[in-house]
Curated annotation (Swiss-Prot):
Cited Gene3D superfamilies: 3.40.50.2300, Nucleotide cyclase, Transferase(Phosphotransferase) domain 1
InterPro entries with a match to the protein in the record: A/G_cyclase (IPR001054), A/G_cyclase_CS (IPR018297), ANF_lig-bd_rcpt (IPR001828), Cyclic_nucleotide_synthase (IPR050401), Kinase-like_dom_sf (IPR011009), Nucleotide_cyclase (IPR029787), Peripla_BP_I (IPR028082), Prot_kinase_dom (IPR000719)
Residues carrying covalently attached carbohydrate according to the record: N66, N131, N319, N341, N366, N380
Entry protein name: Receptor-type guanylate cyclase gcy-20
Lineage: Eukaryota, Metazoa, Ecdysozoa, Nematoda, Chromadorea
Length: 1108
């Protein structure tokens, strides 16, 4: 005993000092296309098996594991969000998953940024994820498409095939074949001895599209490599199409090269496999027998991993898959009910990779911690993966080898059909980075084919390349060739002349687009006195609201016109210029500019009193005026959106033929009615060359331009101007805050031009009211550095700005409206809040009222109207009672009784919602329902009640008491048809009650029924069998009913097709220990002479009914 106590003490001390490794697991749970291969319910427990192995091998003995599970559903955006939660909220040390390509790329990118190790598995087959130079913290154990392409290249070399055709389709799987296509295309480009002669994509796989494609391919190649989605019957249809197209001869060879493949086999839902030619998934009508298609498979090779051959699955792997399924009920998955479906009884195809991935991580981490045991190294992806080189035995018994870069050295196999038309493993290919070792398992190539196919037939693909008789053909060919040459020359000359003519016409047409006639311009008429001192056409009296164009008629620099029912701003140019062809080309291209953050260039007016350049009018003015005159406060999101808009517009300009703006100021940044920045004033270099810039515009000019105004404007100068504009936005003041400085613009310009170690720049004091990202301030300072070479490019600026996003996707216009609403009167807000609260409370009260009373009755009571009693000539009344409920309740606490009834009645309520049935009362274990009121439904009331009753009994087969799983619930049900009177009784607590002898009779049917049986009256039986039909009943015979005498009653057995009630031998129920009769507010007259009964809250039961 003393030794045992010491041992327990040591264990407790050991546990207290265990550190926890937080493991993030990412799965796809409900994506139907990947459930069989990587589904959560059939693979997640593999980490527990791997954990046991880690413990058995004494890896990471000082650490325990804590698992956090996220479901990405193979969605790129969802995976990105979930991995951010894991990294920032859950603070995991490693991520295992995800299992799909697009999600995998998103997670690998983020993990590389956070330097957290990621081990991916399953369907992550794209070569991008395995690119260690790109994702240095990600390891994948999946067979990727790059390895497959290398194996294909080696097979082509082995058999002397220099060219091939690639056919693929993304129908049914948008990831697998798209990745395969990229690597096959890359392989064909990078290898001079292997050429991809033709590649074609089939958008929608049908027998017609397959045959059309094959006929086209027959003109391009004989070695055909194909990739299709698995589990859709596409491969079978493709091979069938080769037969129908006459291409299943020895001349052709078809290679299915793809990851996630089972080779000649197809998975079934029960975990078994069958041959591909027997595939019935998504079966396309081929018109051929399976035997005919099987014969055509003799011209097929499969390149895949050892999952393509069921005979390679070891006993060790079979035991592993059994553990995966059985341990899903353990922590942290606790998947019992959700995993109970029969389709989840077999482990996912790639569950073994999950276990191997987790073990590889533990192996690498253990080795890393041996070198440096500091805690920070747990999630240091670069450090952990520096020891990723390893070789270990996988769960399936095969050797798993990773090199120092984390790339898996994979073993790929070539499968073929033998002479007996049965699949066999023909060769293996060991793929190590770029080297492939080919090992054939056959003794002679005759086992593969009688004659090796040629990549190019001797007479060509059309059979016309064999030399013909020169003497016979020479004269005819010469005449035809000469004729063709003459026609070609004539056609070429005519085509050239026509092209030149059309090009000249097109240029003239496009020139007409930017040349605006002065007569087409109608000057805007002012409604009021013209605004004075408008220093730019974008300025205005207020930017809080949209300004009317009538307030803008003419300024010093601009005139405002109507042109084609659109308001335009015409900039005045006091010069006349004759434009050459290059300048006209510039105007044509500017006219075609279409970007959300560039103001539309309309054109030039050359025939007016002076030269005018026309631009689209922006109603909210310029950014300069918004900053200087707006009374609306800008928050950080508003500022960031404005800066981002400017960077996007500037990026478009720098990427275009213009290369730079040259005169970027905040006055050029216009704001439209959606609060979006539109950069204006770009281009027109030939016009600006002869114009002197205004002094105040030089506040945005770069120092190098101020020192030499004759030099050409460069993109670096735009970046400087961008920095000045950003300072205006962040400080909500003009450039260099002239209003609050003593210096005049000339002095500031001189100081900027002078430069020095501490050059003059605007202040970046943003105040305390707005929180600005410090990284944004650093970026602004980088933009206005003295040396142009040290300033970031616009691409770098955009990249930095994208990195500063806070994850919000709010539109700026919506944000502005939110700001305006925020600054609305407090009275309006309070009224709105109170109105919302009142509406919500009204909704809650309505929901509660509609649960207590029928909607039409409740609506009348709400309106203060009297609900008159109403007679319903024919309805069906339903009573039920839980058998031996008192005995069952005696084994439960009061709270457990409530939970039991809540679970049971929740199921019943769901069944009621599927039928036109009104639930009157539930008191204790009693249940009263009626159909045919308050809405009359003809004779359908008996059908709805019957189906509901059958549904109740059917649901009990799967219902389990949570705290007493061995116990079973059984019901006794009674049904009667007849007339009733329904009305509302009471004022303080009004109840919708039923009155009539039919109610009492239905209650007697229940109390005189048997467990698990539906007891119906003769009238109900007549309605079921003669009126509505479709139900099976059985006569019980004559029964003495209390208060009714002798009655013939019946059992409802079920519908003609559908659920059937259990046999009369009811299942064993809880032993009756005591009988407690409880009658709630029920009006039940003397049982012997009662002609009318009423029921408001409970049923009138017999001695064998219990209520708790």
């Amino acid at each position: 005993m003393r030794i045992l106590l010491l041992l327990l003490q040591n264990i407790l001390v050991f546990c207290q000092f265990l550190q926890t490794i937080k493991v993030g697991l990412m799965f796809s749970k409900d994506t139907a296309s990947v459930i069989r291969s990587v589904g959560y319910r059939t693979s997640a427990a593999a980490v527990l098996v791997a954990k046991d192995r880690i413990r058995a091998e004494h890896l990471l003995d000082q650490y325990d594991f804590n698992f956090t599970i996220k479901f990405d559903e193979c969605s790129e955006s969802l995976a990105a969000g979930k991995v951010v939660e894991l990294l920032t909220h859950d603070n995991v040390d490693v991520i295992i998953g995800p299992t799909c390509n697009r999600a995998g790329v998103a997670v690998a990118s983020l993990a590389d940024f956070y330097n957290v190790p990621v081990f991916q598995w399953g369907l992550t087959t794209t070569a991008d994820i395995g690119n260690f130079s790109r994702y240095q913290t990600t390891v994948t154990l999946s067979l990727d498409t790059h390895s497959i392409s290398l194996a294909v290249r080696e097979i082509l070399r082995q058999y002397g095939w220099s060219e091939f055709v690639f056919i693929y389709s993304n129908d049914g799987d948008e990831e697998k074949c798209a990745a395969m296509k990229d690597d096959m295309e890359k392989m064909g480009i990078e290898n001079s001895d292997v050429t991809m002669a033709y590649m074609i994509q089939i958008q929608t796989v049908t027998m017609e599209s397959l045959q059309r494609t094959l006929l086209e391919v027959s003109k391009r190649g004989r070695i055909i490599i194909a990739c299709f989605a698995s589990g859709r019957g596409f491969k079978k249809a493709f091979i069938a199409s080769t037969v129908l197209a006459g291409m299943s001869t020895e001349e052709y060879l078809y290679v299915f090269a793809e990851p996630q493949s089972r080779g000649f086999y197809v998975d079934e839902a029960d975990g078994k496999v069958h041959y591909s030619w027997d595939d019935t998934d998504g079966q396309l009508v081929t018109g051929l027998t399976n035997e005919q298609i099987r014969d055509a498979y003799g011209k097929v090779l499969y390149i895949c991993d050892n999952m393509g051959e069921p005979t390679t699955i070891t006993t060790q792997y079979t035991n592993f898959t059994s553990q995966v399924i059985s341990r899903m009920a353990e922590q942290p998955f606790n998947c019992v009910q959700d995993c109970s479906n029969q389709s989840y009884k077999h482990a996912a195809t790639y569950a073994g990779q999950l276990a191997d991935s987790f073990y590889a991580y533990a192996f690498a981490l253990n080795k890393s911690l041996t070198q440096d045991p500091t805690r920070s190294n747990l999630k240091n992806g670069s450090f952990v993966l520096s020891n990723i080189g390893m070789t270990f035995q996988g769960v399936g018994g095969e050797a798993v080898t990773l090199d120092e870069s984390g790339s898996r050295i994979v073993q790929v196999y070539m499968f073929a059909m033998n002479s007996s038309l049965l699949p066999y493993m023909a060769a293996s290919l060991l793929v190590n980075v770029s080297e492939v070792v080919f090992t054939p398992f056959y003794k002679s190539e005759s086992e593969l084919w009688s004659v090796r196919p040629l990549s190019r037939p001797k007479c060509g693909f059309t059979g016309l390349e064999c030399p013909a008789d020169f003497v016979k053909e020479y004269l005819v060919y010469t005449i035809i060739a000469a004729f063709i040459v003459i026609l070609a020359l004539l056609a070429g000359c005519a085509g050239l002349l026509y092209t030149m003519h059309m090009k000249r016409k097109e240029m003239e047409r496009q020139d007409l687009l930017w040349q605006v006639a002065f007569v087409e311009l109608q000057q805007v008429q002012s409604k009021s006195r013209a605004e004075a001192s408008m220093h730019s056409f974008a300025s205005g009296p207020s930017t809080s609201t949209k300004m009317t164009v009538e307030s803008r008629t003419e300024t010093t620099n601009f005139i405002f016109y109507h042109y084609h029912q659109e308001v335009v701003a015409a900039k005045k140019h006091d010069l006349l210029v004759l434009f050459d062809a290059n300048q006209k080309s510039e105007f044509r291209q500017m006219r075609n500019f279409d970007n959300d953050n560039l103001n539309k260039f309309i054109g030039l007016c050359l025939d007016g009193p002076q030269l005018l350049s026309l631009w689209r009018f922006c109603s909210r003015g310029s950014l300069s005026d918004v900053i200087s005159k707006s009374s609306m406060q800008m928050d950080s999101f508003f500022m960031f959106s404005l800066i981002r808009d400017i960077s996007n517009g500037l990026y478009f300009i720098h990427s275009s033929f213009l290369k730079c703006h040259g005169q970027l100021t905040s006055r050029c940044c216009l704001i439209d009615d959606r609060w979006q920045i539109k950069i204006s004033g770009f281009g027109l270099k030939s016009v600006r060359t002869f114009e002197n810039p205004k002094k105040e515009d030089l506040l945005w000019a770069s120092p190098e331009y101020l020192r030499n105004e004759d030099q050409e404007r460069l993109p670096e100068g735009d970046i400087y101007s961008f920095g000045i504009i950003c300072a205006e936005i962040l400080t909500r003041s003009s450039a260099f805050d002239l209003e609050n400085r003593k210096e005049k613009p000339d002095v500031i310009i001189y100081q900027v031009k002078k430069g020095g170690h501490n050059p003059t720049r605007p202040s970046l004091d943003t105040g305390e009211t707005v929180v600005i990202n410090p990284a944004l301030l650093h970026l602004v300072r980088d933009c206005w550095t003295e040396r142009p070479s040290e300033r970031p490019s616009i691409e770098q600026v955009r990249s930095h700005l994208n990195g500063m996003k806070d994850g919000r996707k709010t539109n700026l216009m919506d944000h502005v409206f939110n700001m305006l609403e925020t600054y609305a009167s407090t009275l309006e807000e309070e009224v709105s809040d109170r109105t919302k609260e009142l509406t919500e409370e009204k909704k809650k009260s309505d929901v509660l009222l509609y649960r207590m009373l029928p909607r039409m009755v409740a609506d009348k009571l709400k309106l203060g109207q009297t609900v008159e009693p109403e007679t319903f000539e024919q309805v069906t009344i339903f009573f039920s009672d839980v058998v031996q409920f008192t005995t069952l309740a005696g084994k439960c606490t009061p709270l457990q009784v409530v939970t039991l009834l809540n679970d049971l009645y929740t199921i019943f309520d769901g069944i009621i919602e599927q039928n036109d049935v009104y639930k009157v009362e539930t008191i204790g274990d009693g249940y009263l329902c009626v159909s045919g009121l308050p809405h009359r439904n003809g004779n359908d009331h008996i059908r709805h009640i019957a189906r509901m009753s059958l549904g109740f009994l059917s649901s009990l087969e799967f219902f389990r008491v949570q705290h007493l799983p061995a116990e079973r619930i059984n019901l006794r049900i009674g049904i009667n048809c007849g007339s009733v009177v329904a009305g509302v009784v009471g004022l303080t607590m009004p109840r919708y009650c039923l009155f009539g002898d039919a109610v009492n009779t239905a209650s007697r049917m229940e109390s005189n029924g048997k467990p698990g049986q539906i007891h119906v009256t003769a009238e109900a039986n007549r309605m079921l069998t003669q009126v509505v039909g479709g139900f099976r009943t059985e006569s019980r015979g004559e029964v003495i009913i209390k208060g009714k005498g002798v009655m013939e009653t019946f059992w409802l057995l079920g519908e003609e097709s559908g659920y059937t009630a259990p046999s009369k031998a009811a299942p064993k129920v809880i032993q009756h220990r005591q009988s407690i009769r409880s009658i709630s507010p029920i009006l039940e007259k003397n049982a012997e002479g009662s002609e009318t009964s009423s029921l408001s809250v409970d049923q009138a039961g017999d001695n064998n009914s219990e209520t708790v």
